[in-house]
From Swiss-Prot:
Its EC number is 3.2.1.4. InterPro entries: 6-hairpin_glycosidase_sf (IPR008928), 6hp_glycosidase-like_sf (IPR012341), Glyco_hydro_9 (IPR001701), Glyco_hydro_9_Asp/Glu_AS (IPR033126), Glyco_hydro_9_His_AS (IPR018221). Residues 1-33 form the signal peptide. It comes from the Eukaryota. GO terms for cellular component: extracellular region. It comes from Oryza sativa subsp. japonica. This is Endoglucanase 6. GO terms for molecular function: cellulase activity. It is an enzyme of class 3 (hydrolase). Disulfide bonds: none annotated. The lineage of its organism: Eukaryota, Viridiplantae, Streptophyta, Embryophyta, Tracheophyta.
Length: 508
């Protein structure tokens, strides 16, 4: 399990050499390879099969996994089987799972045609999450937000198929509010309803109807789930940014999914009180501000809602903070090798989520024939945004000082000792006997590569500004994969698999 996302604002202004590295397709400090983005896309989706909880389907492709968590929810007399383990542990955390579902869906919504033959695989990955979220919200005014005792789970190193730690169930309700996790769940269901609108209209309607009800609950009973369930969800997934950003985020997705005027009015009415003016260069399972601004800006750029012009201004400011040398905006830091970098663990979660916003916004700008305004005469074209996003994807796939891919199973060199229980322990097929809580300690401490490849998993990656990476299980901040690293990466890989050559991008 990852420690909570560290929200540290970048303060370093990147040198001119890094600007060249990021914006020029030819001038990079590593040898750029010809990447098979389609293969990487396929593998990034396959990763989610390794994170599945519940009864696995006949078409399960990662065969070293088996059924697990078949009695989840029984402690509360509800069915909470299914869903995803968030990372390398065996707990189901609803907050990051919902964000994962939202971002997978956003990728399909914006870049669906680019998924090509992998579109159905991606929809299945979304549905594994939304099916679970429907179970977790089946009781009115209640959202079941976690299954498993994180502290007990983290004291063990055992396969999900063997886990014997308490499967404690945690929920938010009117007496124990959790507007943040509930509104994110509503966003996930609303986004999912768009994904399945044509493929399964009946399911799409059920998702949207539930999203509406869950958002109403989130808004009516306000409060952070970190207060209601502090001992259960902290420090793993405390919501440090508060719940106001999730309420705006949920309303934005419900407006996009339903086109109901009430959600537009909600955003308009609550823009100030819920902090929409906060232009923060962060986006992830905890903080939604940058995502809100990009998502709502599409309405402005498409000429559908000029009232929300302030969101576009915020989105432009955010983009300028990612483009070194373009403006005087406070800048995100980049490593010497060109990796977008934030201090703390699991840096790749920032890399993939911020890169996704760069790509999504670049497409909105292209369709509107617009540019990013950075003030004082500075501006950036959509192509510049795409180049930065592509540079980050290429770094992940191997164009970096270590010449290694940070995606398991992609390329000749990739992490072999990832911090992941199921991957690091012998499979049930290879070792049918149960491995108990402490029985996995020897495997955890072993210097041997993991016996089971969690294909497609992207690890946390370099966590300092030196591009260094110790391929070690114990350094979980760098070696642990998460669902919310891969979720935004799917859309990025889909786009670049269909549009790999910057020279062929439309001139902006």
């Amino acid at each position: 399990m990852l420690a909570a996302s560290l929200r540290v604002e970048a303060v370093a202004v990147v040198a001119a050499a890094v600007l060249v590295l990021l914006l020029s397709p030819a001038a990079v400090v590593v040898v750029a390879g010809q990447h098979d983005y389609g293969d990487a896309l396929h593998k990034s989706i396959l990763f989610f099969e390794g994170q599945r909880s519940g009864r696995l389907p006949p078409d399960q492709r990662l065969r070293w996994r088996r059924d697990s968590g078949l009695h989840d929810g029984a402690a509360a007399s509800v069915d909470l089987t299914g869903g995803y383990y968030d990372a390398g542990d065996n707990v189901k955390f609803g907050f990051p799972m919902a964000f994962t579902a939202t971002l997978m869906s956003w990728g399909l919504i914006d870049f669906g045609r680019s998924f090509g033959p992998h579109k159905e695989e991606a929809r299945k990955a979304v549905r594994w999450a939304t099916d679970y979220l429907m179970k977790a919200t089946a009781k009115p005014n209640t959202v079941y937000v976690q299954v498993g005792d994180a502290f007990r789970d983290h004291s063990c190193w055992e396969r999900p198929e063997d886990m014997d730690t308490p499967r404690t169930v945690y929920k938010v309700d009117p007496s124990h509010p959790g507007s943040d996790v509930a509104a994110e769940t509503a966003a996930a269901l609303a986004a999912g309803s768009i994904v399945f609108r044509d493929a399964d209209p009946a399911y799409s309607k059920r998702l949207l109807d539930r999203a509406i009800a869950v958002f109403e609950f989130a808004d009516k009973y306000r409060g952070p789930y970190s207060s209601s369930l502090h001992d259960a969800v902290c420090p793993c997934y405390c919501d440090f940014s508060g719940y106001k950003d999730e309420l705006l985020w949920g309303a934005a997705w419900l407006h996009k999914a339903s086109r109901r005027r009430e959600y537009r009015e909600y955003i308009k009415k609550n823009e100030v009180v819920l902090g929409a003016s906060e232009s923060i260069n962060e986006f992830g399972w905890d903080n939604k501000h940058a995502g809100i601004n990009v998502l709502i800006s599409k309405e402005v750029l498409m000429g559908k809602d000029e009232y929300f012009q302030s969101f576009r201004v915020n989105a432009d400011n955010f983009m300028c903070s990612l483009l070194p040398g373009i403006s005087n905006h406070p800048q995100i830091q980049y490593s010497p090798g060109g990796l977008l970098f934030k201090v703390g663990g699991s840096n790749m979660q920032h890399v993939t989520s911020l890169s996704f916003l760069l790509l999504a916004y670049s497409n909105y700008l292209s369709h509107a024939g617009a540019r990013v305004s950075c003030g004082a005469g500075g501006s950036a074209s959509p192509t510049q945004l795409r180049r930065v996003a592509k540079r980050q994807v290429d770094y992940i796939l191997g164009d970096n000082p270590l010449r290694m891919s940070y995606m398991v199973g992609y390329g000749a060199r990739f992490p072999r000792r990832i911090h992941h229980r199921g991957s690091s322990l012998p499979s049930v097929a290879a070792h049918p006997a149960r491995i108990g809580c402490k029985g996995g300690a020897a495997y955890y401490a072993s210097a041997a590569p993991n016996p089971n490849l969690l294909v497609g998993a992207v690890v946390g990656g370099p966590s300092d500004a030196t591009d260094a990476f110790p391929d070690a299980r114990a350094v979980f901040q760098q070696s642990e994969p998460t669902t919310y690293i891969n979720a935004p990466l799917m859309g990025l890989l889909a786009y670049f698999s269909a549009h790999p050559n910057p020279a062929e991008w439309a001139d902006d």
